[in-house]
């Protein structure tokens, strides 16, 4: 260690970069599950991507995370890089975000974003509470593309993916060294296969750098013929904490926004904490005794703190959620005696 020229070098077991990081919980249990595989989990510093087509609530999920971070740290500030200008101040107000703690930076090309964000990161010290949101990189042009347009040059731009890869390659070390959460809104496109699938735009650089990539799908929520909101599905494309390809439902209504209790009913039905004795009715189950509660609930009656609090506090429900969604952190290599037993069986 004495010969290294890097000041932050340390014995691995003592390194501050491998200590447990603060986890920031959001107010929506299902979002916490998507981020960490735990009801009472949340997100840690690193790169999170919310990707999907237009009007898929990508910015809202990003601001929900930013709000949780700024509530946890009263001295926290947000750097908001804006290329789409579709997020007015009223949007921040609806999430209860103090806009006096938000630095709004308009951007027009990838290089402009890269230069400014790196300048900001060079000035940020470990221990500073800063969260960064980029909305978005999906339609952000490269500098060459802009210059070609001004010159009326219609040649294809081959630099954009390289510049995006360069951007995320440069910022990723800072996120981990300085404990900075970076939340990026991005677009998706459909592959041209027979059974097409959604792919995050921007090339491989985003995939390599991201800790979490969520691809959003949706379907309409109707009351009769009127559309009252959307049912979103968070598809876990990549995660360091959650099993990939997991699907977490989230409900959003025009009147009440994101439902705090989104997705929990399906999970509780699967775990056995709630049963559906007949169409449109639900009952809770005491998992210690196996007894079914006397009270029956309509769907709308399940959207309440009193209904969910006992279930969310139940260790068995938490264990079910973690087993279903959390990525395993068990030993990668087999124990020596297990390996020896395998060889002995082969020799017989």
Functional labels for PLM-detected ranges:
Residues 107-179:
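Phosphate-binding/switch loop-helix module in NTP-utilizing enzymes
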Residues 92-93, 144-147, 194-196:
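Short acidic, glycine/serine/threonine-rich loops at helix termini
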Residues 1-13, 221-348:
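C-terminal regions of RecA-like/P-loop NTPase motor modules
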Residues 157-271:
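Phosphate-binding/switch region of NTP-binding enzymes
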Residues 95-102, 148-157, 199-203:
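A short alpha->loop->secondary-structure connector
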Residues 78, 131, 182:
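Hydrophobic "anchor" residues on beta-strands that sit immediately upstream
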Residues 1-101, 118-122:
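The Walker A/P-loop phosphate-binding site
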Residues 87, 140-141, 191-192:
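Catalytic P-loop NTPase motifs of RecA-like helicase/translocase cores
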